[in-house]
Amino acid sequence: MRKFLRMTRKSMWLTGAALLAVAATSSIALAAVNVKSEPTASFSGASVTLTGGEFSGLGNIEAQAELTVTGSATYTCTNPQGHASPGQNPVPAQPGSSGPVGLGNSEHNGRGTISNLKASVAAPPTPSAKQVGCGGTGSTKWTVTLDTLTAEAAHLEVTQRNKLVFCRNYALGGAATGTAC
């Protein structure tokens, strides 16, 4: 009889522990990040700046936001006689990133904010005259000079414990609040 009682207590303890584990994981799964205000993007030349993103429900584990941008570069070509001609083909710019930035939620009861997140594209290695669409059939005598760098698209990811909790895509000329990923 004692053996039976010990076995019963042990199985009840294991069952209770299993139920507790299920309850804990399901409550974590049901917890969701609430977006109080969506971050808005402002495009200016080679840069994109995000402001105004407010989140709650993040808990006390620091959430990270990272903004990446892509864009293009335009060039002017100058021939050996000194005459400038705009290139006809934009060239992809080097992508840029804000790097991961904490939202401050671990210090503010689970509320996090994107106050001023900025990333910029950079000039790629100088292309050839042929790549930018001037200089005929690959003449190496043309001088290629950077004209403009333009950020054209941005991608925001908010992660917590390496899990994506919020994502937006932004486009030059598109809605300031972007679109869901």
Region annotations inferred by a language model:
Residues 2-4, 30-31:
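Well-ordered, non-transmembrane segments within structured domains
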Residues 15-26:
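Bacterial N-terminal signal peptides
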Residues 31-181:
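Mature extracytoplasmic or otherwise solvent-exposed domains
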Residues 3-15:
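Bacterial N-terminal signal peptides that target proteins for export
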